[in-house]
Amino acid sequence: MAAVRDYKTALEFAKSLPRLDGLSVQELMDSKTRGGLTYNDFLVLPGLVDFPSSEVSLQTKLTRNITLNTPFVSSPMDTVTESEMAIFMALLGGIGFIHHNCTPEDQADMVRRVKNYENGFINNPIVISPTTTVGEAKSMKERFGFSGFPVTEDGKRNGKLMGIVTSRDIQFVEDNSLLVQDVMTKNPVTGAQGITLSEGNEILKKIKKGKLLIVDDNGNLVSMLSRTDLMKNQNYPLASKSATTKQLLCGAAIGTIDADKERLRLLVEAGLDVVILDSSQGNSIFQLNMIKWIKETFPDLEIIAGNVATREQAANLIAAGADGLRIGMGSGSICITQEVMACGRPQGTAVYNVCEFANQFGIPCMADGGVQNIGHITKALALGSSTVMMGGMLAGTTESPGEYFYQDGKRLKAYRGMGSIDAMQKTGTKGNASTSRYFSESDSVLVAQGVSGAVVDKGSIKKFIPYLYNGLQHSCQDIGYKSLTLLKENVQSGKVRFEFRTASAQLEGGVHNLHSYEKRLHN
């Protein structure tokens, strides 16, 4: 029998062993040995915990030039992301991509609503003239979702300031034919052109008013600050904002047909920060040409291309000028592409291989599809992705489009794949986002690559996203790293270890041997 070692030498002995426990990511994702893997097929091994989870930074790259405070992204699906979802995704540190299964004008209006929701200096405030009627002002309040319109002499943005119309000025005015010059607040408190954002916020605190109008030396309106935005800055410290305008970041999706060029012009005019080229198979001449056109026409606009599942697909899009990649083909909960088209790839393997290639060129990648819980998010990030796109996880939330309905006593919302027949027939086939996404514009018989269904009410993302955020912090803590950057660096160096899971191991890792139980995700 071998002699028992001195316990004081345990660390030295562990270091002397020929290999670390578990597998490196390269060994785990060897397709020749294990085939294609997805998130349930492996675990990340625990490391040393020497810090509180609250110290974990989840800051990450969305594209070459856009950084987010969280890796959470909402999918451009017509049952997931419209303006309300995009607003709160940005407030909570992520970003939302508004779907394009609607008219270009409607999509641009949704982008505009996000950009106007929270601003630092509002450099293009909506203004009215003294001869605007009270009824028109009320209609504008309903249309734009806010009140507080500066009144200028000529009704133009840089005109001489005459006053401001707020809710309290018009709320109880019954005669809608009255002119705003008769009810507006005259001589409002103003700030001088050139003051800083912090100085403007201090003035707002002192005057206890809702808006601060910024004017030049001649009394002409220059910009505006909002008190509600000051409050939001306190409530949402992680909010994703433009470094220049301080507006919330907003993304949107377009297709790759010629009509999408005019759609994109409207979106850029509305303030779009980043565009996703929405295609189930991104390695197409249509997408390559669209990337080149966008780079020539809107050189400052960030482009996320895809979807891709292989290095070869990624190489074409990177060479064309993509600023980010979207990974996934057939792995979404409502997607049947792999079943119908016999084309796709298990998501874990797709994420690892594409990220390993793209990261060498500084191109951030987004894992899209197959994510069902916090553990899956952690694994996608460990495999190299910078962000994680969620569709099914956010469907059924308060902020997702659609009305709730009841079935068998449960409160539900509709959720459908963009490759479903329902989505393809939402508008005319020409210009429809779904037919464009699946190259089906000219088909007389539509072949579905998705299904329509319903999901249970999940409540508001104002509670759900913080749950994901805290859970991901705890996950990084268990693995032993204080940031996503450190996690990924140590995965690549081989210090972070993995374990392949058999089917029995997967059963063991879930709830088992209970007569009944309740699974509550958060309080």
Swiss-Prot record:
It comes from the Eukaryota. InterPro entries: Aldolase_TIM, CBS_dom, CBS_dom_sf, IMP_DH, IMP_DH/GMP_Rdtase_CS, IMP_DH_GMPRt. K(+) binds at residues 330, 332, 335, 508-510. The active site is at 335 (thioimidate intermediate), 437 (proton acceptor). Pathway: Purine metabolism; XMP biosynthesis via de novo pathway; XMP from IMP: step 1/1. Gene3D superfamilies: Aldolase class I. Homotetramer. Seems to be able to form heterotetramers composed from more than 1 of the 3 IMPDH gene products (IMD2-4). PANTHER family: INOSINE-5'-MONOPHOSPHATE DEHYDROGENASE, INOSINE-5-MONOPHOSPHATE DEHYDROGENASE RELATED. HAMAP family: IMPDH (MF_01964). Present with 26300 molecules/cell in log phase SD medium. This is Inosine-5'-monophosphate dehydrogenase 3. It comes from Saccharomyces cerevisiae (strain ATCC 204508 / S288c) (Baker's yeast).
